[in-house]
């Protein structure tokens, strides 16, 4: 295989500023996601003083806050953390779909990386598994994705 120039992001959060959006709905799950993201960024050299936690009611409100945060120029990355758990009505589908589309749109339009840490699960047990038990911690994964993307974009 021929040699290709490869651009990769380093996992160094030193000097970067992060906005962490976290929903209050299902906060017993979301707080674990936040803890995972903050711990990860700190282990990568980031400072808690460079992280701002924004609490919102639920997932539907995340895109508008992410848009304002990205446009502010104060943050290198936005990490969106929440948990939408399926109920007996189609409400889950509307909220999950619109929040997902909205967060992706913010990243594309602003050029600021947005980490997607919005759990969309069928059960509470699945959400707990993805917030720090056997399914890993999706807050860590969202923070890692944002950090790596920031560092890659710096090289493009």
Curated annotation (Swiss-Prot):
<dbReference type="InterPro" id="IPR034964">
    <property type="entry name" value="LS"/>
</dbReference>
<feature type="binding site">
    <location>
        <position position="130"/>
    </location>
    <ligand>
        <name>(2S)-2-hydroxy-3-oxobutyl phosphate</name>
    </ligand>
</feature>
<dbReference type="Pfam" id="PF00885">
    <property type="entry name" value="DMRL_synthase"/>
</dbReference>
<feature type="binding site">
    <location>
        <begin position="59"/>
        <end position="61"/>
    </location>
    <ligand>
        <name>5-amino-6-(D-ribitylamino)uracil</name>
    </ligand>
</feature>
<dbReference type="GO" id="GO:0009349">
    <property type="term" value="C:riboflavin synthase complex"/>
</dbReference>
<comment type="pathway">
    <text>Cofactor biosynthesis; riboflavin biosynthesis; riboflavin from 2-hydroxy-3-oxobutyl phosphate and 5-amino-6-(D-ribitylamino)uracil: step 1/2.</text>
</comment>
<dbReference type="GO" id="GO:0000906">
    <property type="term" value="F:6,7-dimethyl-8-ribityllumazine synthase activity"/>
</dbReference>
<protein>
    <recommendedName>
        <fullName>6,7-dimethyl-8-ribityllumazine synthase</fullName>
        <ecNumber>2.5.1.78</ecNumber>
    </recommendedName>
</protein>
<dbReference type="InterPro" id="IPR036467">
    <property type="entry name" value="LS/RS_sf"/>
</dbReference>
<dbReference type="GO" id="GO:0009231">
    <property type="term" value="P:riboflavin biosynthetic process"/>
</dbReference>
<keyword id="KW-0686">Riboflavin biosynthesis</keyword>
<feature type="active site" description="Proton donor">
    <location>
        <position position="91"/>
    </location>
</feature>
<feature type="binding site">
    <location>
        <position position="25"/>
    </location>
    <ligand>
        <name>5-amino-6-(D-ribitylamino)uracil</name>
    </ligand>
</feature>
<feature type="binding site">
    <location>
        <begin position="83"/>
        <end position="85"/>
    </location>
    <ligand>
        <name>5-amino-6-(D-ribitylamino)uracil</name>
    </ligand>
</feature>
<comment type="similarity">
    <text>Belongs to the DMRL synthase family.</text>
</comment>
<keyword id="KW-0808">Transferase</keyword>
<comment type="function">
    <text>Catalyzes the formation of 6,7-dimethyl-8-ribityllumazine by condensation of 5-amino-6-(D-ribitylamino)uracil with 3,4-dihydroxy-2-butanone 4-phosphate. This is the penultimate step in the biosynthesis of riboflavin.</text>
</comment>
<dbReference type="GO" id="GO:0005829">
    <property type="term" value="C:cytosol"/>
</dbReference>
<dbReference type="InterPro" id="IPR002180">
    <property type="entry name" value="LS/RS"/>
</dbReference>
<feature type="binding site">
    <location>
        <begin position="88"/>
        <end position="89"/>
    </location>
    <ligand>
        <name>(2S)-2-hydroxy-3-oxobutyl phosphate</name>
    </ligand>
</feature>
<feature type="binding site">
    <location>
        <position position="116"/>
    </location>
    <ligand>
        <name>5-amino-6-(D-ribitylamino)uracil</name>
    </ligand>
</feature>
